[in-house]
Design a protein with these regions (language model features):
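Acidic, metal/ion-coordinating pockets
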Residues: 2-311
């Protein structure tokens, strides 16, 4: 169905409500969660879940959805980047680069070296490094040593002078959970102690709380944004634990980092914008909200509710 919408409406349809907003900033960054490939010979990677797993893919042309809306960079460190194996990942990189977008991400420190990449952005003599990492939230012992690897990379980048500020995007947590997990807390504190100036987490699909650590902001989940995984943006499901009830509302974050004349980092100003993943509102009493794949800004009581969720520190 998403492909029908793409063919009927064009690439500019999906992020139409944000294109002008994104064009105002220096850099728009998204978490691209899925495989973009035209290779029909690729098969879904075995996730050990039988038919219960989720595999996300779309044609390479879907990268135009990002470029059409002034998105400049995509993080590829997430649990769906390898849904169709290493070749699917490489095809995604090719699709993104063909649209002039940058990308970054470390899927796992033991993966193919080509999957490790940081993104450096320089303006007015100041350089910001974007890095992202996926970890196994179901194995908090971190057998792959990703935590130590993350700390090492941030420390090296800051101490070597490669970047004046580091933004770490971490992928992990409990899907549809309202509270941060222990590994989330550990990895976030580890990143900031190593020198990260801003930490943003993804994976939960719903809005979680935030924290301030050593004058650095940490956001544990912004929720979904333009999400094609479900035809229904909201469907009350009391049989699932936790119940899926607030997957439509989400947050978009704008960060303004300030530096002195010598390029020394001075501070940050964070603005949160309440959004929802669909342009179709849910009427009072409805247990289903249709997803038209066109997120929009929201205001009023729902926006206030979403902002309240971001203030939960538990």
């Amino acid at each position: 169905y998403k492909r029908q919408v793409y063919e009927r409406e064009g690439a500019g349809y999906f992020l139409k409500n944000f294109a002008d907003f994104f064009a105002e900033d220096d850099l728009t960054v998204v978490n691209l969660e899925g495989v973009l490939t035209d290779n029909n010979a690729l098969y879904p990677r075995d996730k050990g879940k039988g038919d219960d797993g989720y595999w996300f893919r779309g044609p390479a042309a879907y990268a135009k959805v990002l470029s059409a809306a002034s998105v400049e960079v995509a993080s590829l460190a997430n649990n769906h980047a390898f849904d169709y194996g290493a070749q699917g990942f490489r095809d995604t990189i090719a699709a993104v680069e063909a649209e002039g977008l940058g990308w970054f991400g470390t899927y796992n420190k033991n993966r193919d070296p080509e999957t490790e990449k940081f993104y450096f952005y320089t303006k007015d003599g100041v350089t910001i490094c974007l890095m992202s990492l996926l970890w196994d939230d179901y194995n908090p012992q971190d057998p792959n040593g990703n935590g130590a690897y993350l700390r090492q990379q941030i420390t090296e980048i800051k101490q070597s002078g490669q970047a004046d500020a580091v933004i770490a995007i971490l992928h992990g947590g409990q899907e549809y959970g309202r509270h941060r997990t222990k590994p989330q807390t550990i990895f976030t504190k580890m990143a900031i102690s190593a020198g990260a100036d801003l930490v943003i987490c993804h994976h939960a699909h719903v809005v979680m709380g935030m924290d301030v650590i050593n004058n650095r902001s940490a956001f544990y989940s912004l929720g979904n944004f333009c999400f094609g995984g479900n035809r229904k943006a909201y469907q009350e499901n009391k049989n699932r634990t936790p119940a899926v009830q607030d997957a439509a509302p989400a947050l978009m974050l704008r960060a303004v980092l300030t530096f002195d004349d010598d390029g020394t980092y001075e501070g940050q100003q964070i603005t949160l914008y309440p959004v929802q993943t669909t342009g179709i509102d849910r009427a009072a009493g409805d247990t289903v909200q249709v997803n038209n794949y066109q997120p929009k800004f929201i205001t009023g009581p729902l926006a206030a509710h979403v902002l309240h969720l971001s203030l939960i520190h538990i």
